[in-house]
Amino acid sequence: MVHGEAKAPAGPMGGASNASTGSGSQGMKHSLKAALTTLPTLPVADPLHLSCLNTRSGASTGVWLVVLVPLACLPGLYNTYRHCHPLPHLQALLAIQVGVCGAHLYQEMCLANGQKMAKKEEGQQKPPLLRFLTHPYTPSLATSIAISLLTDIPDPVLALPLTLLCSWLLFRVTHWLFTTFPGSFSLGEGAIMGQSVALAVTCSLHGIISRILWPQKLSHAHEISLFIQTAIVVMSVMVGTIYSVPMLRVPRMFLPYLCVCGVVGVGLASLLLGEWVPLWLWELLNFSPARLFLLGWWFLLTLFAVSITTWARRKNHLPTTVLRKVYHVVITLVFIPGVLLEPSFLLLAATAATMACLLLEVVRVEKIPPFAEVISQAFTPFLDEKDEGLLVLSHIYLLAGVSSPLWLTPCPLGEAKVGEAWQANAVLPLLAGVLAVGIGDTAASVGGTYLGQRRWSGTKKTVEGSLCGMVAQLVVVGVLVGAGLVHLSLGGWGRLLVSAALVAVVEALTDQVDNIVLPLMLYTPLMDL
């Protein structure tokens, strides 16, 4: 978010082409006609019948989660961020599209069988206009038109493949998650995972294609973003292929395939960056003293985390809840210095850690020796009621939750100057995950344990715990303001108070995965401070 990095893409999901702008009205009409002709030939989304769906035990549908990602990306359309180059409109428009498609998942795909049969017995057929408006790929057409008007992609037909791919990925990935990993997600959680994958892969592909078609000199932050985009695409193809070709899940095939994907990824990234990736990474680590400091600090925190986990497993004295909150504190200590000193470097490290955890989960689920058993034993101390399905995602949710503001930010992430005072709408949104989960959730748990007396209706959470979580967030922000690291107006304090209170209430009452929900909920209002 440093203005000097003006040519960097907006986070790992950013990137835009330098195609010539503007097109005639006749070309627009021709493009729309071609798009309307193509739409009826597109496949319908595979149905997910609610009565047959094996969702996470004890969780409500959580359909309201489908609006969180679009709301978090909506600031990309604000005039406040018009100075960013390229404009973050593409990410925001695609996010709105996956939000509408996410609602379609519930409205059309997740109806109970009885409701479907009742509609058939009525023999009522939708009028052509209604069939068009409710077609699962209609949002793709609308988004392609908006992209042609608001971004530097001048023609809806050029944008349509991108928007169609985004919708297809959302439907396909969501369907795959529910059918392949039963009992691991609520409806809302599965939808938000599908939205995230669709948005990340689509924006990453666009960034790579733009780099190939319209090469230009890259800024440092742009290089990091392009490297992350390449990693996202390679990782997605690798995981998709593993689950499409059963032979690749055999131990003697898995490791060679993993090596091949690594070589391909390094080669592709080297071509896109114009520099051999290992050398580029070495230069990246030595870019500034702050990065060396962060590496040392993160190494010490990793040793502490591994040591306390090993001790807890041997002694069996530390309750699971306490051990999990210790990791909340550790990740807070990881992210706060990173955001304040080197947000772009933190972005790269957080993305790499998340991908590593996802890869380890694939190894564990597929029981690939000799690592699967070791991984399962390492994850055992962190399991809770939300990990009763096939997947164990609590640690990934925690890491992804605190990292999500870095991935969604509409402006480039650059190097912070030590001692520089950030505007509140620049640094606080990047700390949304830390404030909501690392600070608020942890303080709520500790406060509820020792001070809690009045329980929220229908839950084990206490009002006192929620108040502790809210106050803790405000105190941390106050410390940042007092240290001169953040400027916050009086009106900003009021909005922060309301946002922290809302997050505290949701944390107490929701049965969805709060490590993902809370950061997204806090991020959006913090962008308006």
Task: Cite the ranges covered by each PLM segment.
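Hydrophobic alpha-helical transmembrane segments
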Residues: 1-529
